[in-house]
């Protein structure tokens, strides 16, 4: 296994099975963040993650963290909160604000550089990247974004500025995703937060099998049309 240097003149990726074991999943470096390359990466179970000032690094970890939306863990306190939720949740209303929120609302720093923001905004304009927004009194207080692959959604990042805002985004999205035929959410790498929400690890090969099947399936044509998913009770 060796780290592969990508060419700027080809969007081809090596097989994810050739990724390094340490650091886990590192597959390649270089290339660019063009829409064609990003889409090729997601279709092959690969995603970019790198620190500011470093070359673009491409990953496909083993195991892979996934969330089956129907197994989303909702705590009792979150259920009580959601019943009286003050939030309104929308889909694809403010992609730019959401990715900026994810980039800026991180005390420990962020990999979401200006180039990354612009790259995913281009994907959004092409209909491949999507956002879920959480509002309170017309102020954006949380949200999440990711990339669609048929009935699989590749979650990228989320942020929260008020109590339970990002959890609300995920809860409401999962409910609508299930209702419209969505099957799986890619969480990339398991952490304590995603684990608490019900995410689990599966072998990379199994994830790639799911991806190969689910990206061929389609959600209803209207699914990603900007709309309100949840409104607070009067």
From Swiss-Prot:
Tagged with keyword Transferase: yes
Catalytic activity, EC: 2.3.2.6
Gene3D superfamilies, A to Z: Leucyl/phenylalanyl-tRNA-protein transferase, C-terminal domain (3.40.630.70), Leucyl/phenylalanyl-tRNA-protein transferase, N-terminal domain (3.30.70.3550)
Keywords: Acyltransferase, Cytoplasm, Transferase
Gene Ontology biological-process annotations: protein catabolic process
Cellular compartment(s): Cytoplasm
Reactions this protein catalyses: N-terminal L-lysyl-[protein] + L-leucyl-tRNA(Leu) = N-terminal L-leucyl-L-lysyl-[protein] + tRNA(Leu) + H(+); N-terminal L-arginyl-[protein] + L-leucyl-tRNA(Leu) = N-terminal L-leucyl-L-arginyl-[protein] + tRNA(Leu) + H(+); L-phenylalanyl-tRNA(Phe) + an N-terminal L-alpha-aminoacyl-[protein] = an N-terminal L-phenylalanyl-L-alpha-aminoacyl-[protein] + tRNA(Phe)
Superkingdom classification of source: Bacteria
Gene Ontology terms for molecular function: leucyl-tRNA--protein transferase activity
Pfam families recorded: Leu_Phe_trans (PF03588)
InterPro entries found in the cross-reference section: Acyl_CoA_acyltransferase, Leu/Phe-tRNA_Trfase, Leu/Phe-tRNA_Trfase_C, Leu/Phe-tRNA_Trfase_N
SUPFAM superfamilies hit by this protein: Acyl-CoA N-acyltransferases (Nat)
GO CC aspect terms: cytoplasm
Protein family: Belongs to the L/F-transferase family.
HAMAP family tied to this protein: Leu_Phe_trans
Function: Functions in the N-end rule pathway of protein degradation where it conjugates Leu, Phe and, less efficiently, Met from aminoacyl-tRNAs to the N-termini of proteins containing an N-terminal arginine or lysine.
Name this protein carries in UniProt: Leucyl/phenylalanyl-tRNA--protein transferase
């Amino acid at each position: 296994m060796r780290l592969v240097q990508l060419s700027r003149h080809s969007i081809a990726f090596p097989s994810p099975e050739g990724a390094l074991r340490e650091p886990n999943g590192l597959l390649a470096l270089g290339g660019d963040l063009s829409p064609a390359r990003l889409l090729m990466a997601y279709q092959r179970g690969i995603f970019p993650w790198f620190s500011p000032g470093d070359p673009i690094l491409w990953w496909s970890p083993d195991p892979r963290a996934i969330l089956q939306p129907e197994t989303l863990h909702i705590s009792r306190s979150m259920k009580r909160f959601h019943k009286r939720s003050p939030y309104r949740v929308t889909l694809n209303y403010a992609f730019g604000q959401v990715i900026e929120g994810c980039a800026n609302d991180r005390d420990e720093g962020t990999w979401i550089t200006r180039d990354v923001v612009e790259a995913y905004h281009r994907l959004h304009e092409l209909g491949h990247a999507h956002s879920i927004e959480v509002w309170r009194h017309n102020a954006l207080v949380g949200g999440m974004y990711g990339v669609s692959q048929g009935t699989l959604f590749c979650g990228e990042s989320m942020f929260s500025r008020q109590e339970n805002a990002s959890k609300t985004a995920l809860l409401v999205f999962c409910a609508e995703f299930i209702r419209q035929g969505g099957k799986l959410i890619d969480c990339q790498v398991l952490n304590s937060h995603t684990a608490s929400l019900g995410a689990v690890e599966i072998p990379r090969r199994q994830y790639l099998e799911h991806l190969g099947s689910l990206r061929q399936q389609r959600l209803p044509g209207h699914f990603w049309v900007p709309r309100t998913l949840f409104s607070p009770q009067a």
